[in-house]
Curated annotation (Swiss-Prot):
Full protein name: Large ribosomal subunit protein uL14
InterPro entries tied to this protein: Ribosomal_uL14, Ribosomal_uL14_bac-type, Ribosomal_uL14_CS, Ribosomal_uL14_sf
Subunit: Part of the 50S ribosomal subunit. Forms a cluster with proteins L3 and L19. In the 70S ribosome, L14 and L19 interact and together make contacts with the 16S rRNA in bridges B5 and B8.
A GO MF label: structural constituent of ribosome
Pfam families, per database record: Ribosomal_L14
Organism: Thermosynechococcus vestitus (strain NIES-2133 / IAM M-273 / BP-1)
Protein role: Binds to 23S rRNA. Forms part of two intersubunit bridges in the 70S ribosome.
Organism ancestry: Bacteria, Bacillati, Cyanobacteriota, Cyanophyceae, Acaryochloridales
GO process terms (BP): translation
Ribonucleoprotein listed as a keyword: yes
Keywords from the UniProt entry: Ribonucleoprotein, Ribosomal protein, RNA-binding, rRNA-binding
Gene designation: rplN
Domain of life: Bacteria
Protein backbone atom coordinates (compact mmCIF):
# COMPACT_ATOMS: atom_id res chain seq x y z
CA UNK A 1 0.00 0.00 0.00
CA UNK A 2 1.96 2.97 -1.35
CA UNK A 3 0.69 6.53 -1.07
CA UNK A 4 2.08 10.05 -1.38
CA UNK A 5 5.26 10.68 0.66
CA UNK A 6 6.08 6.94 0.90
CA UNK A 7 9.78 6.07 0.57
CA UNK A 8 10.68 3.10 -1.63
CA UNK A 9 13.89 1.22 -2.34
CA UNK A 10 14.95 0.91 -5.98
CA UNK A 11 15.26 -2.70 -7.18
CA UNK A 12 17.32 -2.08 -10.34
CA UNK A 13 20.70 -0.73 -11.46
CA UNK A 14 19.46 2.55 -12.98
CA UNK A 15 21.47 4.59 -10.46
CA UNK A 16 18.71 5.59 -8.03
CA UNK A 17 18.69 4.08 -4.52
CA UNK A 18 15.69 5.70 -2.78
CA UNK A 19 12.46 7.14 -4.19
CA UNK A 20 9.77 9.34 -2.66
CA UNK A 21 6.31 8.75 -4.13
CA UNK A 22 4.70 11.94 -5.46
CA UNK A 23 1.61 10.47 -7.13
CA UNK A 24 -0.09 7.13 -7.74
CA UNK A 25 -1.28 7.06 -11.36
CA UNK A 26 -4.69 5.76 -12.41
CA UNK A 27 -7.45 8.20 -11.54
CA UNK A 28 -7.63 11.79 -10.37
CA UNK A 29 -8.31 10.89 -6.74
CA UNK A 30 -6.37 7.64 -6.31
CA UNK A 31 -4.91 7.28 -2.83
CA UNK A 32 -3.08 3.93 -2.65
CA UNK A 33 -0.96 1.88 -5.01
CA UNK A 34 -0.05 -1.81 -4.81
CA UNK A 35 2.16 -4.20 -6.77
CA UNK A 36 2.02 -3.49 -10.51
CA UNK A 37 0.83 0.11 -10.17
CA UNK A 38 2.76 2.96 -11.80
CA UNK A 39 3.79 5.91 -9.65
CA UNK A 40 5.49 9.26 -10.19
CA UNK A 41 8.42 9.64 -7.79
CA UNK A 42 11.43 11.79 -7.10
CA UNK A 43 14.92 10.39 -6.57
CA UNK A 44 16.08 11.04 -2.99
CA UNK A 45 19.35 9.09 -3.06
CA UNK A 46 21.41 8.12 -6.11
CA UNK A 47 24.73 6.55 -7.08
CA UNK A 48 27.20 9.11 -8.49
CA UNK A 49 27.99 9.24 -12.23
CA UNK A 50 24.85 7.40 -13.34
CA UNK A 51 22.03 8.32 -15.73
CA UNK A 52 19.55 9.02 -12.91
CA UNK A 53 20.44 11.92 -10.61
CA UNK A 54 19.16 13.04 -7.22
CA UNK A 55 15.95 15.14 -7.43
CA UNK A 56 15.00 13.73 -10.87
CA UNK A 57 11.27 13.12 -11.32
CA UNK A 58 10.77 9.58 -12.65
CA UNK A 59 8.12 6.96 -13.36
CA UNK A 60 8.36 3.67 -11.51
CA UNK A 61 6.36 0.47 -11.14
CA UNK A 62 5.88 -1.02 -7.66
CA UNK A 63 7.37 -4.54 -7.44
CA UNK A 64 7.28 -5.27 -3.67
CA UNK A 65 5.16 -4.00 -0.76
CA UNK A 66 5.16 -4.58 2.98
CA UNK A 67 1.35 -4.70 2.87
CA UNK A 68 0.20 -8.23 2.05
CA UNK A 69 -1.36 -8.94 -1.35
CA UNK A 70 -4.37 -11.26 -1.54
CA UNK A 71 -4.47 -13.62 -4.49
CA UNK A 72 -7.46 -15.28 -6.15
CA UNK A 73 -6.41 -18.63 -4.66
CA UNK A 74 -6.83 -17.21 -1.14
CA UNK A 75 -3.09 -17.08 -0.54
CA UNK A 76 -1.50 -13.82 0.57
CA UNK A 77 2.08 -12.71 0.00
CA UNK A 78 4.10 -10.03 1.79
CA UNK A 79 7.63 -8.71 1.27
CA UNK A 80 10.23 -7.26 3.63
CA UNK A 81 10.38 -3.83 1.95
CA UNK A 82 8.64 -1.43 -0.40
CA UNK A 83 10.48 -1.43 -3.72
CA UNK A 84 10.03 -0.13 -7.26
CA UNK A 85 11.72 -0.40 -10.67
CA UNK A 86 12.23 2.72 -12.78
CA UNK A 87 10.51 2.65 -16.17
CA UNK A 88 10.39 4.91 -19.22
CA UNK A 89 7.27 6.21 -20.98
CA UNK A 90 6.90 2.92 -22.90
CA UNK A 91 6.85 0.86 -19.70
CA UNK A 92 10.29 -0.69 -20.26
CA UNK A 93 12.78 -0.73 -17.36
CA UNK A 94 15.52 1.92 -17.40
CA UNK A 95 18.05 -0.42 -15.78
CA UNK A 96 19.43 -3.65 -17.19
CA UNK A 97 19.15 -5.74 -14.00
CA UNK A 98 16.47 -6.27 -11.35
CA UNK A 99 17.45 -7.17 -7.78
CA UNK A 100 15.41 -9.26 -5.37
CA UNK A 101 12.14 -11.11 -5.83
CA UNK A 102 9.14 -9.59 -7.61
CA UNK A 103 5.45 -10.50 -7.43
CA UNK A 104 3.70 -12.60 -10.08
CA UNK A 105 1.06 -9.86 -10.44
CA UNK A 106 3.49 -7.91 -12.66
CA UNK A 107 3.02 -10.47 -15.42
CA UNK A 108 -0.74 -9.85 -15.39
CA UNK A 109 -0.14 -6.10 -15.74
CA UNK A 110 2.10 -6.57 -18.83
CA UNK A 111 5.46 -5.82 -17.21
CA UNK A 112 6.92 -9.01 -18.70
CA UNK A 113 10.36 -7.45 -19.27
CA UNK A 114 10.74 -6.78 -15.53
CA UNK A 115 9.55 -10.31 -14.71
CA UNK A 116 12.10 -11.82 -17.12
CA UNK A 117 14.96 -9.78 -15.59
CA UNK A 118 14.05 -10.68 -12.00
CA UNK A 119 16.01 -13.47 -10.29
CA UNK A 120 12.88 -14.79 -8.54
CA UNK A 121 9.14 -14.44 -9.15
CA UNK A 122 6.88 -15.16 -6.18
Amino acid sequence: MIQQETYLNVADNSGAKKLLCIRVLGGSNRRYGSVGDVIIATVKDATPNMAVKKSDVVRAVIVRTRKSIRRESGMSIRFDDNAAVLINQDGNPRGTRVFGPVARELRDKNFTKIVSLAPEVL
